[in-house]
């Protein structure tokens, strides 16, 4: 099972920058992650949630979406649809950090948009790997798992998701 990645950023240039970083990362992790939606409007994300019901998704959200709702409100909707979601805010507004605790959003992390590109990229990659690690740990603790390694990568699958091994 690939982990779905959903992006929501109203600024097209910022969205493309985020997509580039994640796409480069996925080149080496394509069996684990997949960008399933890249949106500029929160309503697109909400429609996707209602139609496809993703589970254990990784969500990159701009806090200050210039739309009918902001990133915090969108995160609350995501949390209702995908309880185990890993929510990462990409923002220039570090003053919103306490609000995420107040709203009980359980954000996995915050990435500053206005930092050096290499640092920006490094944070995103670290958060993707952390999201994978936490989702895998939750799976293993809940179910029987089939675990194997190829090179330096370890793969974990729910035993119920396996139909056949060759």
Please name every model-derived segment.
Residues 1-4:
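Non-catalytic signal-transmission and effector/linker regions of two-component phosphorelay proteins
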Residues 9-10:
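Conserved acidic carboxylate
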Residues 13-27:
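Amphipathic alpha1 helix at the N-terminus of the CheY-like receiver
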Residues 16-20, 35-58:
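Acidic, metal-coordinating helix/loop segments flanking the phosphotransfer/catalytic sites
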Residues 28-35:
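Short mixed-charge
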Residues 33, 55-136:
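CheY-like receiver
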Residues 122-166:
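Conserved binding/recognition cores within well-folded domains
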């Amino acid at each position: 099972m690939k982990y779905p990645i959903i992006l929501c950023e109203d600024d097209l240039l910022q969205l493309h920058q985020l997509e580039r970083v994640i796409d480069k990362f996925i080149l080496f992790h394509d069996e684990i992650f997949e960008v399933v939606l890249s949106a500029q409007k929160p309503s697109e994300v909400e429609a996707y949630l209602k139609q496809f019901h993703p589970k254990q998704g990784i969500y990159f959200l701009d806090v200050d979406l210039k739309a009918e709702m902001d990133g915090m409100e969108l995160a609350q909707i995501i949390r209702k649809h995908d309880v185990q979601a890993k929510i990462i805010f990409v923002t220039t507004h570090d003053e919103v950090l306490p609000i995420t605790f107040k709203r009980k959003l359980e954000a996995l992390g915050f990435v500053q948009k206005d930092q050096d590109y290499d640092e920006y990229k490094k944070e995103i990659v670290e958060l993707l790997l952390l999201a994978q690690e936490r989702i895998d740990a939750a799976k293993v603790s809940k179910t029987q798992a089939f675990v194997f390694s190829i090179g330096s990568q370890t793969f974990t699958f729910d035993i119920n998701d396996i139909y056949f091994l060759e």
